[in-house]
């Protein structure tokens, strides 16, 4: 930690480094179809101590210090495992370059696998659409991957036909 008067000298600090990384993610990765990433929260300062869940942080600092620690947690969504690995490679490359006086690392925690539309899923979706229209309801089409969430079906979708992501978009914080 150092005094803020020297921030543009040899130590930019952890918050500037996190901002640089996030902006480079945006510049290099935005616009790839089916790929989204979102920094869900940032905690930075003199100290940033997480609880056992890793989602609640107690942060301390002052406005006149160069913050030595920043934690960013986010979400990465993708349409295929290959796309996931390409995005992670770009992210690792960005993180490996540092502003003077800084260091950074990135880790990834897998939760839900990718779930591209499979031929079996397309067949079931076509049947569902046919029934929907026969009952006088609107056509049912596959939604853009960027508008869908993760579903438990993604774990078995490579092995059995299925469809997911047809529910209402909802509202509030999880829409």
Predicted regions and their residues:
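Metal-dependent amide/peptide-bond hydrolase catalytic core
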Residues: 1-175
């Amino acid at each position: 930690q150092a005094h803020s008067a020297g921030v543009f000298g040899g130590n930019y600090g952890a918050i500037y480094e996190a901002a640089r990384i996030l902006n480079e993610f945006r510049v290099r990765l935005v616009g790839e179809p089916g790929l989204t990433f979102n920094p869900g929260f940032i905690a930075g300062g003199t100290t940033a101590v997480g609880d056992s869940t890793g989602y609640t942080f107690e942060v301390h600092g002052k406005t006149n210090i160069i913050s030595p620690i920043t934690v960013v947690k986010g979400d990465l969504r993708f349409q295929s495992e290959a796309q996931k690995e390409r995005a992670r490679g770009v992210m690792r490359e960005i993180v490996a370059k540092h502003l003077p006086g800084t260091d950074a690392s990135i880790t990834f925690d897998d939760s839900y696998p990718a779930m591209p539309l499979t031929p079996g899923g397309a067949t079931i979706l076509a049947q569902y659409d046919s029934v929907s229209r026969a009952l006088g309801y609107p056509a049912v089409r596959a939604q853009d991957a960027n508008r869908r969430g993760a579903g438990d079906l993604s774990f078995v979708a490579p092995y059995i036909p299925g469809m997911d992501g047809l529910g209402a978009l909802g509202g509030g914080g999880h829409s």
